[in-house]
A protein has these predicted regions:
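Conserved AMP-binding/adenylation subdomain of ANL enzymes
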Residues: 1-30, 45
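Gly/Ser/Thr-rich phosphate-binding loop
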Residues: 3-6, 29-34, 43-114, 127, ...
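Residue-level signal for inorganic ion chemistry
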Residues: 24, 32-35, 178, 186
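Alpha-helix capping/helix-boundary segments
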Residues: 37-39, 66, 155
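Short Gly/Pro-enriched turn/cap motifs at secondary-structure boundaries
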Residues: 113-122, 139, 169-172
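Conserved ATP-binding/catalytic segment of the ANL
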Residues: 140-141, 147-193
C-alpha cells in the first residue's frame, strides 16, 4: 500500500464488529484482510445495522477456511469478494490465492462457489505438491489427501541453526504439516492440519 501511495488504516487489538464497520465506513476502506471469525462477526453486525460499507471490494481470508455461506452473503449483500489465501511465515507469507480462472466465470454459480471455497492456486514462484506417508506424490484428483509440500524462491530452504530443518524438508521441498487435496485444476483444499 505504501509503495502505491494508498492510505493504510490500522486497527486496535480485539476490535468489535461495530468498530470495524465504523472504520470501513469512516475511512472508506476498499481492501482488508483477516481470519474468517472477524468477518462472520462483521456480517452478523451489518445485517442488523445500517452501516455503509459500499467502499469495500475485497477481503482475503486465511488462518482457517471461510464458510461458503460467508463468501456468498458478502458477495450478494455487499458486493464484496472474499478470497481464500493460504500461507505460512516460511513462505513470506503467501503460498496460494483462490481466484477463478478466466473460463470459470461462465460456469453456474454453484460450481463457481465450490471453487471459491478452496484455498486456491499456487502463488507466483511457489510450486506445490501433496505426498502420502511414503513420500509418493498423490494424484491431483480433488479427493486423494496428502501432506502439502512447497518450494520456490520465496520459500525458506532451512531453519537457521535449528534441528527442525532435518524433519521439515524432503528433497528440497518444505513440509508444511497441512493435509490437502489438489484438484485437476491445481486448487488446493485443506482437509486437516
Amino acid at each position: 500500500a505504501t509503495w502505491l501511495g494508498c492510505k493504510q488504516v490500522y486497527t486496535a487489538s480485539f476490535m468489535q464488529p461495530s468498530d470495524i464497520a465504523e472504520l470501513i465506513q469512516g475511512e472508506q476502506v476498499t481492501y482488508t484482510a483477516g481470519v474468517p471469525t472477524i468477518w462472520i462477526g462483521l456480517l452478523n453486525f451489518l445485517e442488523a445495522t445500517e452501516y455503509d460499507v459500499s467502499s469495500l471490494r475485497r477481503i482475503p481470508v486465511g488462518g482457517a477456511a471461510a464458510p461458503s455461506a460467508l463468501i456468498e452473503k458478502f458477495a450478494k449483500q455487499f458486493g464484496v469478494e472474499i478470497i481464500h489465501a493460504w500461507g505460512m511465515t516460511e513462505l513470506s507469507p503467501i503460498g496460494t490465492l483462490c481466484y477463478l480462472k478466466s473460463y470459470m466465470h461462465d460456469w453456474p454459480e454453484e460450481k463457481r462457489s465450490a471453487v471459491r471455497a478452496k484455498q486456491g492456486l499456487a502463488s507466483p514462484n511457489v510450486e506445490l505438491r501433496a505426498v502420502d506417508e511414503n513420500g509418493g506424490e498423490v494424484p491431483w484428483d480433488g479427493s486423494s489427501p496428502g501432506e502439502l509440500q512447497v518450494r520456490g524462491t520465496s520459500v525458506i530452504s532451512e531453519y537457521y541453526r535449528d534441528e527442525r530443518s532435518a524433519d521439515s524438508f524432503m528433497d528440497g521441498w518444505f513440509c508444511t504439516g497441512d493435509v490437502v487435496t489438489i484438484d485437476s485444476e491445481g486448487y488446493i483444499q485443506i482437509v486437516d492440519r
